[in-house]
Amino acid sequence: HALMHGPTFMGNALACRVALASISLFEEEHTMEKIHRIEEITRLEMAGFTDPRIREIRIMGACVCIEVYDPAVLKGYAAFARQRGVFSRPFLSYLYAMVPYVISEAELVQVLDTMKAWFRQR
């Protein structure tokens, strides 16, 4: 079955053009700078936040993940977050957010505060 996926990975002209346009948008809209700023704010907001139920907090770019020891700790989080204007849900033992690159600082803080409030109120 050699080259079975050849058409998928060959230089499809439309796909190449779309990829180049996407790269141009990243450069023109300073997207990488926005992602770095999101990460910086997230690190500042999450600094020092601990809870004995949390195994680890990971942050990379526009993603934050709180891993807990027991997934039952996260039961009910989606409804809790919705009441605070945040659409989010846990997955297994992970409470995470992958925010859009156009998020405002106030909106980002709202997402992070909601995550922290879940642990503080329980």
What are these regions (language model features)?
Residues 1-122:
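Conserved N-terminal phosphate-binding loop of PLP-dependent enzymes in the Aspartate aminotransferase
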